[in-house]
Amino acid sequence: MYQKDNASLQIDLVFKCNDFSNLSDPFLYQPGNLIFESSFWEEVLLCWINIILSEKNTSFPNFIFDKKIFSLSLQIINNNEISSINQKWMDKSGPTDVLSFPMISDEDTTKNLNFIELGDLFISLEMAFQQSLEFDHSIKKEMLWLASHGFLHLLGWEHNDDNELDNMLNFQEYLISKLD
């Protein structure tokens, strides 16, 4: 996994994963599967933060580059829960794969702080599983894909046209490739 000599960076992750032990596919939810562990996501997110901060990518707000502590929540939930959130906050019906709710507003609110509250990230495990079958890759890869997409949104990256979306998707691939 990508390592940068920057031990002073920290991730403050509030992690929640529903109990999916009753799912019909035994390969999806297995105790010990890293995608269900907070420590796995802390390591992944810290790796991605290190990469982003070391590369000074211009797609992100400048004020994130002097922060040392990054706080966010990640919840792995089911289709019913993500449908409810999608309806309430996005005014869209039905489940979606990932929702992100960024907290970043502007430099003035964070300039004297060494931490930044990024926001909340919700991933539907059921949608991730369906998409992993559709795209013929592992559930872990799909979860990393969805997490990277939502995480980039938490950092302020938007895709308002096809070019911006292509750039974002390419950067997601890059981030995931650095985990190997």
Swiss-Prot record:
Main location: cytoplasm
Keyword Cytoplasm attached: yes
Superkingdom of the source species: Bacteria
Keyword Cytoplasm: yes
Gene3D superfamilies: Metalloproteases ('zincins'), catalytic domain
GO cellular component: cytoplasm
UniProt-listed Enzyme Commission number(s): 3.1.-.-
GO biological process: rRNA processing
Keywords attached to this entry: Cytoplasm, Endonuclease, Hydrolase, Metal-binding, Nuclease, Ribosome biogenesis, rRNA processing, Zinc
One Pfam family, short name: YbeY
GO molecular function, one term: RNA endonuclease activity
Described purpose of this protein according to its UniProt entry: Single strand-specific metallo-endoribonuclease involved in late-stage 70S ribosome quality control and in maturation of the 3' terminus of the 16S rRNA.
Stated name of the protein: Endoribonuclease YbeY
Natural source organism: Prochlorococcus marinus (strain MIT 9515)
